[in-house]
């Protein structure tokens, strides 16, 4: 009853309607946002006493940028739940170390009703250093009771939980979908495993990390490159407010990554400055070949980056890889 929760995502989104039920069940009050999702509007709504809020990373990137520019703080907020896509480390660090707000990373899908993992600390994590705990917070957490996860290669062979081997992520549980309404056939396999469409690793403690969506993984010269790793590395640059990495056709390597960035309004770093910054966090061969500047990256209705619309936008610009010209 002491909590006031503000779900930022729309109520048609899995996280939106789940909070709409769980908040009153626990006795918490709610702040219901309107259509204006601008950083200024979000800040003003949060200042109505919100203690907990939840949204996708892109929402918090824009809010943090606004807070910094306006020299503002969040007076009542205690916890931020982040899901929908991978959360950049820079967002976690800024919330926790600059504003004293705890970040809770989670993952789920409508097909999972919706929770799949939650990044609460297991006892062994409390003994780790602050840096090691941040590494854990970057994962999407471990599955709750009744949810099972596994990762496999393309041939369906189970992969080890070593935190290093990426594979197709499968989920199974009492609240995991078997078929869509009126579809007529099961979408889960014979053992009730549901293909989430994500690529992930799972470590020995059961903490899962999304490395990409299957459709967004960049395949260059037969090797996989995670667009999420590139995006998180780019957003760590102090002059970059948002980033999206995609693969574009290349005459030799089939695909090569490029990164599209939105910069803070007053600053626009050189391309090599951004690429050199990214190279500190990824292998040399994974560093994007080009940087494209945009005023805005397309988003879906729930605030996630829309790679489909972004590719169309680049096509409309007649963009091709520099080595394909």
Spans of features found by a protein language model:
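Conserved AMP-binding
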Residues: 8-13, 85
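Conserved beta-loop-beta connector loops within the AMP-binding
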Residues: 143-170, 204-205, 267-271, 306
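Conserved AMP-binding/adenylation subdomain of ANL enzymes
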Residues: 1-4, 12-52, 66
